[in-house]
């Protein structure tokens, strides 16, 4: 179930997914044995949701691990709510709020994700709150925190980092403090709601050379991603590292661009 959520949540990353941490244990509803001609018999819970085996575009190279990291198990209550909803033991609407920058503001990703989650699990409310050019500090305003809290989310997803890393004077300490301010404000208003952080997809830098505008891969994205992962580890957030999954420092931007999914 965790794998399906990651797959539908991030349609831009079309690789088979696996989770770094175990799905939380819960009472078995029942078991069914599935046989396969080429694989040994294995046991499946009857509430298991199949994950479609979707591949990246053929041009994508040097892909990293596509996994969701949750070493503290903060998402366990969320997975359990999804399980109960899918099994028909709950009719409560599960509410997800996704805040971030332009790739959330574009709405295609979150709205498609919300539709697929609803088709699979039932009563899912998926609200996107993206702002073009947003930094994480864009949301460190009492009114925006109140707007998020008023939706009574079961999960909040944070997708920032692109605009922070575009600053040529990018400072890791400042970025860390800004994330800390946002997370502290969210936790003050939503103390029992898990937070999932995603890293940026990669970006290009622009500069002038011989009176012509030239583009190159932004080298600060990798530094920002490292800062975000360190912050999440230090502060108990779950992380999905999209940047690493699509190729990281060496291939992320090139993979997107060659597949005509990104341009400088």
Q: Model regions: which residues?
A:
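Alpha/beta-hydrolase-fold catalytic nucleophile elbow
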Residues: 159, 198-199
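Catalytic His-Asp segment of secreted/periplasmic serine-dependent ester chemistry enzymes
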Residues: 202-264
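Extracytoplasmic/secreted cell-surface and envelope-processing proteins
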Residues: 24-26, 106-108, 165-170, 204-209, ...
């Amino acid at each position: 179930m965790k794998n399906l959520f990651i797959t539908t949540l991030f349609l831009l990353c079309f690789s088979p997914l696996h989770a770094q941490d175990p799905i939380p244990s819960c009472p078995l509803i029942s078991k069914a044995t599935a046989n396969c001609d080429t694989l040994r018999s294995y046991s499946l819970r009857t509430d298991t949701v199949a994950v479609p085996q979707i591949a990246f575009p053929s041009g994508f190279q040097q892909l990293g691990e596509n996994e969701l990291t949750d070493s503290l198990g903060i998402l366990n209550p969320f997975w359990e709510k999804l399980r109960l909803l899918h099994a028909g033991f709950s009719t409560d609407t599960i509410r997800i709020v996704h805040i971030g920058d332009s790739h959330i503001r574009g709405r295609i990703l979150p709205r498609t994700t919300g539709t697929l989650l609803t088709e699979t699990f039932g009563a899912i409310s998926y609200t996107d709150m993206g702002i073009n050019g947003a930094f994480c500090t864009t949301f460190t305003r009492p009114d925006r925190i109140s707007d998020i809290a008023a939706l009574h989310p079961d999960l909040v997803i944070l997708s920032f980092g692109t605009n922070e890393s575009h600053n040529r004077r990018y400072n890791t300490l400042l970025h860390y403090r800004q994330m800390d301010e946002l997370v502290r404000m969210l936790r003050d208003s939503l103390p029992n709601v898990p937070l999932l952080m995603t890293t940026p997809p990669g970006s290009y830098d622009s500069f002038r050379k011989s009176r012509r505008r030239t583009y190159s891969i932004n080298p600060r994205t990798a530094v920002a991603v490292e800062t975000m992962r360190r912050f999440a580890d230090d502060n108990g957030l779950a992380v999905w590292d999209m940047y690493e999954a699509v190729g990281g420092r060496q291939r992320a931007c090139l993979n997107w661009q060659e597949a005509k999914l990104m341009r400088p």
